[in-house]
Amino acid sequence: MKDLDTNLQALLTGFRNAIGVPALLLFSAMIGFGSLAQEQGLSLYISILSTVLIWGMPGQVVHVELYGLGAPLIAVVLGVAGANARFMPMTLSMMPVFADSPHNRKWNYLISHFISINTWAEMLHRGHEIRADRRVSYFLGFSATCMFSGVIGVFQGYVLFESMPEMVSLCLIFLVPIYFGLITVSYTHLTLPTTPYV
């Protein structure tokens, strides 16, 4: 994928590569989350907002459960932060992919918000195949597609709550840890570059 001549090409390639298993997985899992949020009494607006702002299924489930229990805001914040702490090592391991990108390093704080299991695995797997100055655009195209499919899934699950058995919604949520395990196993054979990406 070194022939990505423009940022737009890289963005669209990221979009195209996300369509399929990554987007479908998040769409399906977020259907389960949307029905769970409806069951706990969250509004559709808050359910979608929590997806965009928290962007991590464990943290989102903690948010919904603590909200349903009437926990104070500080408890919700600490619970979400603790549940999503797994993103710290994922973020640290992925940042070298962007080391040679020409963007201002301050943007890494914003970029890191879009990291998910899908994007982390994708960039560690394909990052070295993409020109350094196109990696951020590719990442944003891939991530935005995953997030958008997740938001659509939340909406779908919220609206279909009444007709969806609870067991189905819980099974859909459980897709995420299963997928994470499968990705981890499938990428253990990869030897990541030990030198900076070029």
Segments from the language model and where they lie:
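Hydrophobic alpha-helical segments embedded in the membrane of multi-pass proteins
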Residues: L26-S28, L170-I183
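Structural signature of hydrophobic alpha-helical transmembrane segments
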Residues: Y45-T51, V80, P165-V176
